């Protein structure tokens, strides 16, 4: 009995050595490994292959090409399943969406000596800590980076706009951060653009928008007290919150966006909204700013289909519905009607509206978060409304940058109050045209209808002057009310 066991063990040893020799020969002849590490990996893979064949898990075909292709397809399926789990994870989607949004902004901007895009990696949490540590907002690192290092430095290049890849809700910390950022943006005359999350409206996603009858009533609730208070602040006019999300890319797949390394089919069939890659609409608004600046030198032509607010070339994805029809996924997450667009704008948001059946959308308004104050006179109400529109804030901010830069250069010169006033008025009139029939391009180059600068001496401070600039922009069409009357004879037109 003992002799039989010894003979069996010896036979197994000889068999293993023979098998090992054969395996080594396969690896050598097939040139399957370059070093010892690859050699061990190759042995493991061949061993697994043989094991699956012996156990019946893998059926070999007499046609070798069919067998190999079948095996490759199975590997692609397994890898695709793993890739889908990774790519549809919330954290990964957020990261990919941020990078693709930044890529979209830079790709669609003509950067150069006159237009630069600077990127700073910072989270909402880090920014909030920065402001909380500072006694005042002007002692924060954010203020020093945005204001002091550029606008407040001789030879610095002031920022024209700040774009934050964040989403703000109604959380107290979000409101505190928005307030602090608005103070920095107002001091530096650099409007801050970001996004409003669906949570701002009390929704889990923007798909719940259709269930709400009146958006304004949402913000009448007690929990929105901080938001209402923020809208009343002067600095909130330097904040613009875009919404909803924008589709960043088509799903990967042979029929949509093929991959080169392996046959990857992304598990997106149009039914699960969360599996699409959505990004921040502030990047889309950013491209409107950079295009307007490249064309006219101002960020005024940024709204409307014909006025610079058109966002073209959005990713589109079609899918088959349960009824067998072909539908297109809205590239702006949800369709927004004209009435709903006005509701969002009236409540301090900048909606991106998709044009049905196309691959483009448009920003029809650039309403800041600020709520226009109500006065007794029409003129005062008109001024208050103008000060809430970002296209005018951008123009005024650019004048503020130049005024400070020019007058810094005049320090130490023998300039009287009258000379200073004359100099500033001559300068600002270079951007004025009183031609109301001028083309949109001309009005974009000359954004002011009227302008005047008054300079006065500061009592008790010889050589110190205070300048106040009065600017009237070219008004842009906001809305047109249409009235229809069916009559037998046409009446004479009204005079004027």
Predicted regions and their residues:
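Generic, well-ordered alpha-helical scaffold segments in large soluble proteins
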Residues: 49, 78, 82, 98-105, ...
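Long, contiguous, structured domain-core segments that constitute the functional module of a protein
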Residues: 263-422, 479-482
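C-terminal edge-of-domain segments
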Residues: 452-496
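Extended, regular secondary-structure scaffolds
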Residues: 151-331
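Long, charge-patterned amphipathic interaction tracts in eukaryotic proteins
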Residues: 97-170
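N-terminal-proximal low-complexity accessory segments that begin disordered
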Residues: 2-125, 132
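Short, glycine/acidic-rich hinge or "gate" loops at secondary-structure transitions
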Residues: 90-97, 115, 202-203, 438-445
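Short, hydrophobic/π-rich interface segment
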Residues: 419-444
């Amino acid at each position: 009995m003992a002799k039989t066991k010894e003979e069996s063990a010896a036979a197994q040893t000889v068999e293993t050595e023979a098998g090992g020799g054969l395996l080594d020969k396969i690896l050598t002849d097939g040139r399957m490994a370059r070093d010892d590490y690859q050699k061990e990996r190759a042995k493991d893979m061949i061993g697994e292959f043989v094991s699956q064949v012996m156990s019946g898990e893998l059926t070999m075909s007499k046609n070798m090409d069919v067998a190999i292709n079948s095996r490759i397809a199975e590997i692609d399926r397994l890898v695709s399943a793993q890739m889908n789990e990774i790519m549809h994870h919330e954290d990964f989607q957020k990261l990919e969406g941020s990078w693709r949004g930044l890529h979209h902004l830079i790709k669609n901007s003509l950067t150069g000596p006159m237009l630069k895009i600077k990127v700073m990696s910072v989270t909402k949490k880090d920014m909030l800590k920065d402001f909380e540590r500072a006694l005042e907002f002007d002692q924060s690192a954010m203020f020093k980076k945005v204001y002091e290092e550029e606008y407040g430095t001789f030879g610095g290049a002031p920022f024209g706009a700040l774009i934050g890849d964040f989403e703000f809700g109604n959380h107290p910390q979000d409101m505190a951060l928005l307030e602090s950022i608005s103070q920095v943006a107002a001091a530096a005359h650099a409007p801050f653009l970001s996004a409003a999350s669906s949570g701002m409206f009390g929704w889990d996603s923007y798909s719940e928008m259709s269930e709400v009858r009146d958006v304004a009533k949402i913000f009448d609730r007690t929990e929105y007290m901080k938001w209402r208070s923020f809208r009343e602040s002067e600095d909130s006019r330097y904040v613009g919150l875009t919404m909803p999300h924008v589709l960043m890319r088509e799903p990967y797949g042979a029929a949509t966006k093929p991959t080169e390394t392996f046959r990857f089919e992304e598990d997106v069939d149009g039914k699960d909204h969360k599996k699409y890659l959505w990004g921040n609409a502030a990047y889309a608004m950013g491209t409107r700013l950079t295009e307007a600046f490249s064309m006219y030198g101002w960020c005024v032509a940024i709204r409307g289909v014909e006025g610079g607010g058109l966002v073209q070339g959005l990713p589109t994805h079609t899918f088959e519905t349960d009824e067998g029809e072909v539908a297109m996924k809205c590239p702006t997450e949800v369709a927004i009607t004209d009435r709903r667009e006005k509701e969002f704008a009236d409540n301090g948001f900048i909606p991106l509206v998709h044009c049905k059946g196309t691959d483009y959308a448009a920003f029809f308004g650039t309403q800041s978060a600020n709520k226009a104050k109500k006065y007794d006179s029409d003129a005062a109400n008109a001024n208050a409304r103008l000060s809430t529109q970002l296209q005018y804030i951008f123009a005024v901010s650019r004048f503020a940058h130049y005024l400070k830069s020019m007058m810094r250069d005049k320090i130490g010169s023998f300039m009287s109050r009258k000379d200073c006033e004359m100099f500033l008025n001559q300068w600002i009139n270079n951007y004025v045209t009183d031609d109301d029939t001028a083309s949109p391009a001309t009005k974009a180059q000359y954004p002011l209808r009227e302008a005047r600068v008054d300079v006065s001496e500061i009592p008790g401070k010889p050589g110190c002057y205070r300048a106040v600039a009065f600017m009237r922009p070219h008004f842009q069409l906001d809305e047109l009310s249409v009235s229809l009357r069916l009559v037998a004879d046409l009446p004479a037109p009204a005079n004027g």
